[in-house]
Amino acid sequence: MAKINLTPKKIYEQEFKTSMRGYDKTEVDEFLDDVIQDYTVYIALVKELQEENAKLKAKVTSASASRPAYASATSEPSHATGNIASASNYDILKRISRLEKEVFGKQIVE
């Protein structure tokens, strides 16, 4: 992660060299004031998001710790549902076979 080099205080205390044809000092100051305000908002937002991230990570950890009790109960399907699925697959295959005979049987006759 990149490190933040500037703080609102550093921006405020930054001194610029002056030259004969330099920038307008008030314009630079106004711009830096805007930068300071934005930077302050960004710092608060990052802090808020880090706190939210920590809370969510704690939630995930606690949820995954309690998960094994539920996982063992739901991981094994009952044999009754397995029999129903195989019976319905058999019925579907019979139906498809009958439909294919009907469709392709007519094409061969024509």
Swiss-Prot record:
Metal-binding in keyword set: no
Location(s), subcellular: Cytoplasm
Chain segments annotated as coiled-coil in the UniProt record: 37-67
One of the Pfam families matching this protein, by short name: DivIVA
GO terms under biological process: cell division; regulation of cell shape
Gene3D superfamilies according to UniProt: 6.10.250.660
Signal peptide (UniProt feature, chain positions): none
Similarity annotation: Belongs to the GpsB family.
Subunit structure, as described in the record: Forms polymers through the coiled coil domains. Interacts with PBP1, MreC and EzrA.
Name this polypeptide is given: Cell cycle protein GpsB
Protein's organism: Streptococcus thermophilus (strain ATCC BAA-491 / LMD-9)
Gene: gpsB
